[in-house]
Amino acid sequence: RTLRCAAAVPSARKGARPMLDLNHVSMTFNPGTVNEKKALTDINLHMESGEFATIVGSNGAGKSTLFNAIAGSFIPDTGSILLDGVDMTFQPDFRRSKAIGRLFQDPLKGTAPNMTIEENLALAYLRAGTAPHAIFSRISRKDKEVFREKLALLDMGLEDRMKQPVGLLSGGQRQALTLLMATLVTPKLLLLDEHTAALDPATAEKVLELTKSIVAEKKITCLMVTHNMHQALELGNRTLMMDSGRIVFDVKGEERSRMTVDDLLEKFRENAGKNLDNDRILLSKVEK
């Protein structure tokens, strides 16, 4: 691979600079082999500060790969990734983590099971570079008060269990805690990769309501992958559809507010030239 020099790329939009600005981002895995896969192809995505976009797509469409590119899991073959005007294309993931919060589908991924609830929250401060002393010395009384206050907002009784190891919590409790950790220090960008898909319906709904509340209160720029078509149209203010590593449809505003699930599926057929290949998404047509 030829090493490219990082350079700021002007936004395609006029006026205020986007919070997230992807320009011509492409990525091919295992090039020149029988396992070659074009994972992302010429992705252009510009998101304003505070914008909340949902993402749906076919199986293997590149949704998680897009998140990995933004989070710094790999350097794309071509293109640039800017966050709040700063070129992060070549920055490693641990540097980007100070500005980017992320939740995965697996509720066990975002927490340290052998550490207590309060230690995990202190770790979130450390990730953001806010209080590097918190992990290596006694957690202050002030920090504990903040943690207790934030945990109480989850309405799961975790504020009374701060000394307990996180490994004793349920999947829903751990995912709610991960959401709190990812937003304890407000990130510039929040990536939600089907973060309620592995939870039971009641818990998923609770975590989703917490998500909506936190994102709205803190005005966080957010991208959320979902397999639920109703959620894709009801949450946030913008919806993207992906297929074969491309963004094939992007809708917001009045057009989005008028759309039904059937309209969205028809738009996919028009733009991708095929039916949506994702059983979970098709089943979600009848879910609410």
Where are each of the predicted segments found?
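A short, flexible loop at the N-terminus of ABC-type nucleotide-binding domains that lies
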Residues: 19, 28-42, 92
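Conserved ABC transporter NBD signature motif
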Residues: 79-87, 249-251
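ABC ATPase NBD coupling module
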Residues: 87-101, 109, 113, 133-140, ...
